[in-house]
Swiss-Prot record:
Belongs to the MurCDEF family. The lineage of its organism: Bacteria, Bacillati, Actinomycetota, Actinomycetes, Mycobacteriales. It comes from the Bacteria. It is found in: Cytoplasm. This is UDP-N-acetylmuramate--L-alanine ligase. Its EC number is 6.3.2.8. Cell wall formation.
């Protein structure tokens, strides 16, 4: 066996506790990715989830034993029972009957981040963190590396349009993943390259204070080993401040820090790896002019995904891919072929001159970025004469979590006001219990644009179809089941009389 084959076999080997695993909540974005990698590496996997889903069906097709509903008997889906039970920090209550049964049987209960950290061992790890943009940046990095001939393992929070999956066990030495800060789990990982897209107040239900939330990124940067690289966005005050705080001590340990951003950046606290000169929207993508810190002239990058924030995400991915040894021209070609991520400004369809998109945005800054990209799109089309009238942006927003809605209701209102017309649904509570007085109306009251509070989702399709005109862009937005409304809106548009373009 040659060295390459031996290395691949060593990276594929599973530790004893991960050879037969039961996963509680197996259909979730993070958990299903872990399950896919375990199955690819020869593990046996069982699991449970509250409902059937596309992810559950895909895992069954790959050999996982999955039960819908939660009960103690699910731990017997694998002959001999599991060697470990895997769960997440927040989504699964400790009273879950499968977790109770695992404790009764003395079966180790592992948290998802610890399992992902174990799967990364023996790899060169490229991790993307930040309050916003993790999934898109991670996905761009994966697609760029694949185009360059690498076969990285990866685990990402959304489904790559190119790969049709959110996780993969590759033959190469590189492992690319999101480092989720929401519950502090990014401190389980030891990155060789770390990207921080931005740092802004979030997840205060877990951290309790802005200071504690910010500190987790400092601690994450400190986990970089000698010879590693930290990539930070200099346009974002939070990540720029991170570079100022940790840059000197990382340099003492032989860790480089590179920044990316736009503008002059003359007072940047760290070397500028790449600078965005300009962004020009085009249809559902755009053209970026950028310049590397070690090159004398600008280059052009044509993206198929919209928004200036996506151009910055692409430049972060470019720096990380270069650090992995990929060829620059090939990286650019790979980024230009990036087709997006499931539920990230995803095109759903077009009817009667109205385009419908879907996006996962569930924080005010994310909402602002997506609506800004949509506004730039319709404005550019009007300048180009592509439409007989300038289209409007109509957003259907579903707040996610009662705690987040209570904290950010005013900020959500301000961000949503960037749209021309707003429909606000009630809160998608997910794991949380309802809070008195916290609902969609609380957000709607803070919107200054024309706004409609609609607590009945069954009426949204027809309502939005009645609001939209040819040339308009409709975006369903949120981390809950608002994603199901796109097809209903298209049905409503299809049923009404035909208009001009």
């Amino acid at each position: 066996m040659n060295d390459i084959a031996a290395g691949t076999e060593q990276r594929s080997a599973l530790p004893p506790e991960l050879r037969r695993v039961h996963m509680v909540g197996i259909g979730g974005a993070g958990m299903s990715g872990i399950a896919r990698i375990l199955l690819s590496r020869g593990g046996e996997v069982s699991g449970s989830d509250a409902k059937e889903s596309r992810g559950v069906l895909a895992l069954r097709a790959r050999g996982a034993q999955v039960r819908i509903g939660h009960d103690a008997g699910a731990l017997d889906l694998l002959p001999g029972g599991p060697t470990a039970v895997v769960t997440t920090y927040a989504a699964i209550p400790k009273t879950n009957p499968e977790l109770v049964e695992a404790q009764r049987r003395d079966i180790p209960v592992l948290l998802r981040p610890a399992v992902l950290a174990s799967l990364m061992r023996g790899h060169r790890t490229l991790l993307v963190s930040g309050t916003h943009g993790k999934t898109s940046t991670t996905s761009m990095l994966i697609v760029a590396l694949q185009h360059c001939g690498f076969d990285p393992s990866f685990a990402v929070g959304g489904e790559l349009n190119e790969a049709g999956t959110n996780a993969h066990h590759g033959t190469g030495e590189i492992f690319v993943a999101e480092a989720d800060e929401s519950d502090g789990s990014l401190l389980q990982y030891d990155p060789d390259v770390a990207v921080v897209t931005n740092i802004e107040s979030d997840h205060l239900d877990f951290f309790g204070s802005d200071a504690a939330y910010t500190q987790v990124f400092d601690d994450f940067a400190d986990r970089l080993a000698a010879g590693g690289l930290l990539v930070v966005c200099l346009d974002d005050p939070g990540s720029r401040a991170l570079a100022e705080r940790v840059g000197p001590r990382l340099a003492e340990r032989g860790v480089r820090v590179l920044g990316y951003g736009s503008g002059e950046l003359a007072d940047a606290p760290v070397p500028v790896g790449v600078r965005l000169h300009s962004w020009e929207p085009r249809d559902v993508g755009g053209v970026a002019q950028f310049q590397l810190g070690d090159e004398p002239a600008p280059r052009t990058l044509r993206l198929s995904v919209p928004g200036r924030h996506m151009a910055l995400n692409a430049l972060a991915a470019l720096l990380a891919a270069r650090a992995a040894g990929a060829d620059l021209d090939e990286i650019i070609q790979g980024l230009e072929g990036f087709g997006g991520v499931h539920r990230r400004f995803q095109f759903v369809g077009r009817e009667n001159g109205v385009r419908v998109f879907d996006d996962y945005a569930h924080h005010p800054t994310e909402v602002r970025a997506v609506l800004g990209a949509a506004a730039a799109l319709v404005e550019q089309e009007a300048r180009d004469g592509a439409r007989s009238r300038q289209g409007r942006v109509i957003v259907v927003f579903q707040p996610h979590l009662y705690s987040r809605t209570a904290t950010f209701a005013t900020e959500f209102g301000a961000a949503l006001s960037l749209a021309d017309e707003v429909v606000v649904l009630d809160v998608y509570g997910a794991r949380e219990k309802a809070m008195p007085g916290v609902n969609g109306a609380l957000v709607a009251q803070a919107v200054t644009a024309p706004v409609h509070y609609q607590p009945d989702m069954s009426r949204v399709g027809r309502q939005v179809a009645g609001l939209a005109l040819p040339g308009d862009v409709v975006i369903t937005m949120g981390a809950g089941d608002v994603t199901m409304l796109g097809s209903q809106i298209l049905d409503g548009l299809r049923a009404r009389p035909q208009h001009g373009r």
